[in-house]
């Protein structure tokens, strides 16, 4: 952590550097932005991951030898402040109140295909009337071709006029004059020059979009312009956010593809916008998002399944090349995140490394993994308070390890929690049923069980030679 007198000394040095001749201006700016990045991203958090430190060190060593950087970096004196851009409102009515979630899209002219209208349609059609009150959609038409922009605005206003009037849909454009130079950039990763230009501009497109959306809502989710949404995705997102109350997070992921479905606190958007703008020519946007998450001290990916958003475009926005990427975790209908009420979990199975019991109960993409279980081994969930359960679903094994399932087991529910020297546990259990092909699912549990449930346990009925993965335990309460 920087001390005040150290900061003062640094600023005195920087102030003296301003007196250097003009040819030193760019180098000074290079030093300044690296200093500011550390100040803003490091001073508030306890550590920076080594990989991200290396990124900063490598970037800081690049020779800043062009006047174009002056324009790019001149507004970076405050990473929490807005980037100075005057936007053009192509279709919008004033936002009367702050919403819960802003959905941001950036779109450019494609050589083949156009999926933007279908994406906007999916957002609105997959949302209920109540959900529509809590969202705003911001579309950044980022292409410099004014004829294309005019045509797209006409199509959008014709199809979604009522959403524009209601303040749910805004179409904006950041003028070309605010963009840094996009030609003659470094060819990192030996990318061809046109690809470097494409991905570098895309980073700036998103930086300006994030900058605009910083004060429109409490949360922000990033989409591409060729995506379809799961039914009631907002309700699912709200449920996840509520379940993480009190937990530190920077990025939540609701898709495993690129930067589709990345969710942020809106108060982080200014820093993320500055970050993308600073390193716009270094690497693709999704890589930068990963580094940003690490710099703000979220070490691990927090991704939820099933995915809420699916890539539907067939042709890429880069050169119109074929792009058949699909998220096989996507479920379009009735996405229902379980309640999974607070509970303690334990097992007497031999746990492998850090794949502990609690990971099977999390809605994050992780699981419990144990060495071969024996007859009588148990995996127990003790709820903080007795609950009424509507539905239970337990899945074992994974795609990669399809034989690491529970081959012989049953699921029991219990009552009458008794204290013990080691942990709380129930004194009596009632068997609900057996596992079939490694899975257990039962609806209407509350109609079959005459008591409030204090415990739930997975009971191994026969020794197996295979290891056991419990991929997910899902509980819905009434």
UniProtKB/Swiss-Prot annotation:
| Membrane-protein topology | Single-pass type II membrane protein
- The membrane-spanning stretches of this chain are 24-44
Q: Which residues lie on this side of the membrane: Cytoplasmic?
A: 1-23
Expressed, tissue-wise, as follows: Expressed in heart, adrenal gland, testis, liver, brain and fetal brain. Not expressed in pancreas.
Give the CC-aspect GO terms: Golgi membrane
The answer to keyword Transmembrane applying to this record is: yes
Pathway per its UniProt entry is: Protein modification; protein glycosylation
Q: State where it is primarily located.
A: Golgi
BP-aspect Gene Ontology terms: protein N-linked glycosylation; viral protein processing
The protein's annotated catalytic reaction(s) are: N(4)-{beta-D-GlcNAc-(1->2)-alpha-D-Man-(1->3)-[beta-D-GlcNAc-(1->2)-alpha-D-Man-(1->6)]-beta-D-Man-(1->4)-beta-D-GlcNAc-(1->4)-beta-D-GlcNAc}-L-asparaginyl-[protein] + UDP-N-acetyl-alpha-D-glucosamine = N(4)-{beta-D-GlcNAc-(1->2)-[beta-D-GlcNAc-(1->4)]-alpha-D-Man-(1->3)-[beta-D-GlcNAc-(1->2)-alpha-D-Man-(1->6)]-beta-D-Man-(1->4)-beta-D-GlcNAc-(1->4)-beta-D-GlcNAc}-L-asparaginyl-[protein] + UDP + H(+)
Residues modified by glycosylation: 84, 215
Q: Where in the cell is it found?
A: Golgi apparatus membrane
EC class (word): transferase
* Designated name of the protein: Alpha-1,3-mannosyl-glycoprotein 4-beta-N-acetylglucosaminyltransferase C
- Underlying gene: MGAT4C
């Amino acid at each position: 952590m920087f001390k005040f007198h150290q900061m003062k000394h640094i600023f005195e040095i920087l102030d003296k550097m301003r007196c250097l001749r003009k040819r030193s201006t760019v180098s000074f700016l290079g030093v300044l932005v690296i200093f500011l990045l550390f100040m803003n991203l490091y001073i508030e958090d306890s550590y920076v991951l080594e990989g991200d430190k290396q990124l900063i060190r490598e970037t800081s060593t690049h020779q800043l030898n062009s006047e174009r950087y002056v324009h790019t970096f001149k507004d970076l004196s405050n990473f929490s402040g807005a980037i100075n851009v005057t936007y053009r409102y192509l279709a919008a009515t004033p936002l009367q109140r702050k919403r819960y979630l802003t959905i941001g899209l950036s779109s450019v002219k494609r050589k083949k295909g156009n999926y933007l209208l279908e994406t906007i349609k999916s957002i609105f059609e997959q949302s209920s009337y109540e959900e529509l009150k809590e969202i705003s959609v911001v579309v950044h038409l980022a292409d410099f071709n004014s004829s294309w922009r005019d045509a797209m605005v006409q199509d959008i206003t014709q199809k979604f006029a009522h959403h524009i009037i209601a303040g749910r849909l805004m179409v904006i454009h950041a003028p070309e004059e605010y963009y840094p130079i996009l030609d003659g950039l470094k060819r990192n990763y030996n990318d061809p020059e046109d690809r470097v230009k494409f991905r570098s501009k895309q980073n700036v497109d998103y930086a300006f979009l994030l900058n605009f959306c910083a004060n429109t809502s409490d949360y922000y989710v990033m989409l591409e312009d060729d995506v379809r949404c799961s039914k009631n995705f907002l309700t699912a997102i709200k449920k996840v956010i509520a379940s993480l109350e009190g937990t530190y997070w920077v990025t939540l992921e609701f898709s495993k593809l690129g930067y589709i479905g990345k969710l942020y606190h809106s108060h982080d958007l200014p820093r993320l916008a500055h970050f993308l703008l600073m390193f716009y020519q270094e690497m693709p946007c999704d890589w930068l998002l990963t580094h940003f998450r690490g710099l703000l001290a979220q070490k691990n990916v927090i991704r939820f399944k099933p995915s809420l958003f699916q890539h539907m475009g067939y042709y890429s926005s880069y050169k119109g090349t074929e792009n058949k990427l699909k998220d096989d975790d996507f479920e379009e209908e009735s996405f229902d995140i379980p309640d999974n009420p607070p509970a303690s979990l334990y097992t007497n199975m031999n746990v492998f490394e850090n794949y502990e019991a609690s990971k099977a109960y999390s809605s994050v993409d992780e699981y419990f993994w144990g060495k071969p279980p024996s007859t009588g081994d148990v995996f127990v969930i003790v709820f903080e308070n007795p609950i009424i359960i509507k539905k239970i679903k337990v899945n074992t094994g994974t795609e990669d390890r399809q034989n690491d399932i529970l081959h012989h087991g049953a699921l029991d529910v219990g009552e009458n929690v008794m204290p013990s020297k080691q942990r709380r546990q129930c004194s009596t259990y009632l068997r609900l049923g057996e596992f079939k092909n490694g899975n257990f699912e039962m609806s209407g549990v509350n109609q079959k069980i005459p008591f409030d449930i204090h415990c739930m346990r997975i009971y191994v009925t026969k020794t197996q030679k295979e290891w056991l993965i419990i991929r997910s335990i899902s509980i819905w309460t009434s």
